[in-house]
């Protein structure tokens, strides 16, 4: 049966330094092997703490930029991002994304697994 999942009913992820929701995952009964998260990274100077670098062991991440502008920092280099851009982060590559604009940087993140928590490692710095 088709169903509507909106931002008001989506699971809140509680990631540091960003508003984050998970509208599609195995937890809501989705049988697809994809997890989708919407992330809003506040502008520089916001009171929230930023999320540091992290990596996903055994699976990649695809980031689609909906609005704002920023930089994805990865072990392979810095990638400036803007609306319409897609960034592919290979499995095991340490990365983080920073907002470089004066509006929230809104990202749609795709993972080819229903749960990323077991394969994600957080780091204090690069």
Predicted regions and their residues:
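Double-stranded beta-helix
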Residues: 3-6, 30, 44, 96-126
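Short beta-strand His + acidic residue motifs that chelate non-heme Fe in jelly-roll/DSBH
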Residues: 72-73, 89, 95-101
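Short acidic-glycine-tyrosine-enriched beta hairpin
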Residues: 76-91
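Intrinsic-disorder/low-complexity, polar/charged segments enriched in Ser/Thr/Lys/Arg/Asp/Glu/Gln
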Residues: 32-34, 69, 106
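Catalytic-core "active-site belt" of small-molecule-metabolizing enzymes
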Residues: 2-16
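A generic "binding-loop/recognition-motif" signal
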Residues: 58, 77, 93-94, 103
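Short, conserved beta-strand element in jelly-roll/cupin
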Residues: 38-41, 55-72, 110-112
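A short glycine-rich, His/Asp/Glu-containing loop-to-beta-strand
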Residues: 12-53
